[in-house]
Each structure stands twice: as structure tokens, then as C-alpha cells.
Amino acid sequence: MTRSKVDPKADPIDELADLISPFEQRGMDLSLERMQRALADLASPCADVPAVQVVGTNGKGSIACMIHSGLTAAGLRSGLTTSPHLTSWCERICVNQQQIELAQLRQRLKQLQPLAQLHNLTPFEQLI
């Protein structure tokens, strides 16, 4: 997987702090309704996209990366989202083995900011 260049002088924790609010656990609504409403406002962009969801206790990241690598090697356009990240929010999103660039992630988060605020999306939901 190719990693985007991160400025070593920049604080990676704060690189998107103005667009991704801190995670607050108390009183948080963790139901799917908020995300379903947000997706409906976007005309359900994922409705016709084939997807593989990897769930379980251990090994999810490894299995998801292997599936992503296999699909990309087979010539299929493949995306991967993972959580958590180690040093940069960009680590969470890859398409065809290419990590999203910080500028591109910032632009997309900025475009979706009104929707994220309207539906009170969590940081994880904003990155999906």
C-alpha cells in the first residue's frame, strides 16, 4: 500500500482537527438512523456498490487488506476503509492500494461538513 506524504513537522493528530470534531462518548446516539438519513441526503451513493464487510474479533485488518490486495491485483477497482489509524487520518482510506492524500481528504470532508453537522456524524461516520 502506498502511503501519502505527511509533513513530519505537522502534528498528525491535529491535521484535520478543524473538520473532524473530537469523539464524545457520553450521550451519543449510536443507532444507524443518523447515518441512514445522511446517506439518503446524498441520494444513497453506496446502494449499487458491491461490498465485502469483514467482521469478527481478531484479524479483520489483515483479512480486509488481503481482500483489497487481491481485488486490486485482479484489475478491479477496490477501496478499503480501516480504523483506527496510527499517525494520520489518511491511513483509513485506500483505493487501489493508494492511500488518500491529505489535501483530497480535507477537500471531501469540507464538502461534507454541513451534512456531518446536520446529522451529528461521529468521526468514524464522516470517514466512511
Name what the model sees in each region.
Residues P50-V54, S62-L80:
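A conserved segment at the C-terminal end of the G1
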Residues M1-P50:
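Positively charged, low-complexity intrinsically disordered leader regions
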Residues K60-A64, T87-C90:
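Short active-site-adjacent helix-start/loop capping segments
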Residues D7-P8, L32, Q36-A47, A73-I128:
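ATP-dependent carboxylate-amine ligase catalytic core
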